[in-house]
């Protein structure tokens, strides 16, 4: 009987550890937000990961295109890019696959607030 209790306790502990270790935190959520982002160091990779599959000149007709510094800056100024990413009242949330993690949105917010630094 004691062996069964120990085995059951070990099983419950193993399941608990497994569930706890499977949190869905991304690197950005764990590492924090970049306070002084630049396009080349931070924003470009977010656009490539989350946006260019639909917003690239070579693969889509979805305007605005988000492949270059000038295109992304223009989208922020003229297409409400940040509002769309934040999921505010300016249209459907982008990307369509679901809202970006808050840490990535904050990087874009900081980039815009600092005047769109490229390098």
Question: What is each PLM-predicted segment?
Answer:
Residues 4, 22-119:
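Aromatic- and Gly/Pro-enriched helix-to-coil junctions and flexible linker segments
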């Amino acid at each position: 009987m004691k062996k069964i209790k120990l085995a059951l306790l070990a099983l419950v502990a193993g399941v608990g550890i497994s569930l706890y270790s499977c949190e869905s935190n991304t690197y950005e959520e764990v590492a924090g937000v970049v306070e002084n982002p630049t396009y080349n160091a931070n924003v470009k990779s977010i656009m490539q990961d989350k946006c260019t599959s639909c917003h690239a000149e070579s693969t889509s007709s979805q305007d605005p295109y988000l492949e270059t510094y000038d295109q992304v800056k223009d989208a922020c100024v003229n297409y409400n890019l940040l509002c769309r990413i934040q999921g505010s009242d300016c249209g459907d949330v982008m990307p369509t696959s679901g809202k970006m993690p808050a840490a990535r949105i904050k990087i874009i917010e900081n980039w815009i607030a600092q005047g769109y630094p490229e390098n």
